[in-house]
Amino acid sequence: MKKNEFAVVLASDNRGILPLSVTVFSLLNTAGPETFYKIYVLSDGIDGENGASVERLAAPFDCRLEFIDVSGILEEHDFPHTEQWPVPAWGRVFIPELLKEERGNILYLDIDVLVCRDLTELFRTNMDGKAVGVVFENFSRPGSHFNERLEMPLTCTGYFNSGVLLMNVDVFRERNLVRAVLDYA
């Protein structure tokens, strides 16, 4: 029986190995019998021991796990990388270019996400020509204290969670959206 193959991208460095491991395990442990995840980890210097620990965690599952070094990807761009936004986090911008062999929907997950069930239904979401599917944050409601923290006007309703992104990489490529994001940044 042919399994449904889905690409999932996460991003981490050595400091994030524990939450990365939890997210990977929760993803694989909830996968249905017909689901095969291709997991790509955008890495900024994950050392051999830490990478091997994630590989051992994934080994009992029917999946593919690949680390992609993105440590040099921002050298030509003037992106600010901070503790909150390290190099691997910026890597999500480059997913359509980094994973040229992938087509259709790819799921990006932050490493603080706990997966509670098989994601086949999510991957089969009809994106209807849209480049990205997002979940709007409830905190962006007018009057929320997060509006002040985010320095957004009280009428702002457009803040979304960038830690869960369903990306249609075909649309990104057709519309050259990576270049558009780079030009905007």
Describe every region a protein language model picked out.
Residues 1-185:
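Glycosyltransferase catalytic domains, chiefly GT-A lineage
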